[in-house]
Amino acid sequence: MKAPLHALSLVMLPFGLLTPTWAVEPISLDAIDTVCLKSVLRDCKVLTAGYLNVDWGDDEGAPMLAWQTQSGFTPEAGVLGGFVLLQHVDGNWVRLDAGFDGWRFFPPRLSQDGLLHLPGYTGGTGRYNADRLYQWNDTEWEPIDTKTWLKTVSEQLPADREIWKGVQYDFDNPWSQLVARTALWRGEDGNCCPTGGNAEILLSIVDGRLTVDRVNYVPAAEKLAPPSEEVQ
């Protein structure tokens, strides 16, 4: 994926405002593996940290992105996880995005098609998605809405089937399709034990958001039948 090092990138601020990252104070990464950067968390610990360098063309190996995932707490929300995503612009590291609304975040994954996926989930039994997704549009990293599709996907599920928890995203091979996989619950199910089968949800990006193209439903009987019981 070709990503110019000197492109103008944007940072999302509260209330949806955007500001150029070059207007933000440069950040030193000398202690990226031990010291929390730009964090709101108290007693903050660095869980993972690293770099994603340019992997294409004349700039191969040049610095592009860096990240931290963090753990700590706030007085208002208790124990939390967080992430900080940084971009290399004009010789400096500046903040691209950050979030402190999940229980855990994981190292970002960069696809060959210019999708940057940072997995995350919330606390509690629901383990709802706190993922972040960005798409390179030749000049900047554009944040992609990953939540709206969940409000309408029920229209494409079988009757009496619902999604009660977070889904498992697979964005690693966008050439084949963007995918979300999940178990399905029936109305009488316990939160622990879905009996409604499974769904593979095929997604695409339209106007800056994930949209549902198709839902492949796998009934519970097909999912649960062991190979030894298959008809020969």
Where are these regions (language model features)?
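Surface-exposed loop/turn elements that mediate protein-protein interactions on large endomembrane-trafficking
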Residues: G82-A98, L133-T148, I205, R209
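Positively charged n-region of N-terminal signal peptides that target proteins for export
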Residues: M1-P4
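Terminal domain-start segments
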Residues: T21-W103, A225-V231
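Bacterial N-terminal signal peptides
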Residues: A7-L17
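Short aromatic loop motif centered on NTY/YTY
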Residues: D101-W136, E140-I201, V218-E229
